[in-house]
Amino acid sequence: QIKRRRLEQGMQSLGSTRGAGGHGQNPFAALISPETDEDHGTVYAMNFVYSGNFLAGAEVDMHQNTRFQMGIHPFDFAWTVLPGERFQAPEAVMVYSGQGLGRMSRIFHKLYRDCLIPARFARRERPVLLNSWEANYFDFHKEGLVSLAGEAARVGAELFVLDDGWFGKRNDTTSSVGDWAPNEEKLGGTLPELIRDIEDKGIAFGLWFEPEMVSPDSDLYRAHPEWVIQVQGRRLEMSRDEYVLDLSNPEVCDYIIESIGRILGSCHIVYVKWDMNRNFTNMGSGYLSADRQKEQAHRYMLGLYRVMETLTGRFPEVLFESCAGGGGRCDPGMLYYMPQVWISDDTDAMERLRMQYGSSLIYPSLVMGCHISEVPNH
């Protein structure tokens, strides 16, 4: 939702140290004249082309001059630049409008469609999809999935998405994230066989992953407990029954590329929902040296971008949708790799209208994923 604050002397800011923008703040801010509306008023806006920790601020000094800034959040961040090296900071898009917020939005939309979103998706109409989550949660079997896909196709849906629960021993939130091997007993056969039966109903197939996380009860964690973000010698903090993998470690990134790539290369998957259901806590890396620990959060993002660069290059026709427990990671950095964003887990139709309107202030409506769901919303 759009929030306005009156500038006063001193510093006002918004930001995140969660490892992503978060649900309460997007890496966007604008200075506007008080009377600004959709069609009138002066706007100076910035949007950070980055998916990690950020800080945006406006400082009014004693002479009523305003300094407007945006960048990587300085909290717990440092970077060692050795002789001959350089550090490249993320960029911010700056937009001026003398014709209100509407003009600002149109500039952002055109720029992102023309220059940021992958060209093959920049103007492609998105498929109408049915996601299995609120229909089945973890409780499903092959016959039910195929039947649901058939009903979706009958009413005009073009894509059936199998959400959480298809891999490892995953029947609730407590296990198997990181073990990206299909549960053939639960699926009633191989994943390619399930996809074939669903496609026979006249509908395409998509799949859910949460590649940046790992369950304590998983083969991956048992093999590599050192791969998670953790303060050495301290108790690990869990959220949603999972830990965050340390993507500052190239081995972790290579594992994600290999395991997700193996699934995508084995069958006909046209869409991936890429989820991130928890934030960073207890930052620490077993891979980085003691004097480089404050580089971890940014190195994580560089690792994630390498993963996405590799996978989207290898599977250019797969539509990747960014999800972070809803819209917790919606930013231009993600849009470069994932041209669709799941705006919120709240799919109440009236509430969603407000969210879609707020998101459209910056991002084209083309990128916003939205479900039709039961009322009241789960």
Predicted regions and their residues:
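Aromatic-lined carbohydrate-binding/catalytic grooves of carbohydrate-active enzymes
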Residues: F121-I257, Y271
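N-terminal accessory beta-strand-rich subdomains and adjacent acidic, glycine-rich linkers
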Residues: Q1-Y112, M350
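Composition- and surface-driven signal marking solvent-exposed, interaction-prone regions
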Residues: M104-H109, L145, M334-Y336
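Glycan-recognition surfaces
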Residues: S215-D254, E258, H298-H378
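Short, glycine-/Ser/Thr-/acidic-enriched flexible segments
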Residues: S51, M94, A135, E212, ...
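Long, charged amphipathic helices and adjacent flexible linkers at domain junctions
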Residues: F108-V128
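Residue-level preference for nonpolar/small residues embedded in alpha-helices
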Residues: D76, G144, T190, G303-L304
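Active-site and adjacent substrate-binding regions of carbohydrate-active enzymes
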Residues: Y137, D164, G168, S175, ...
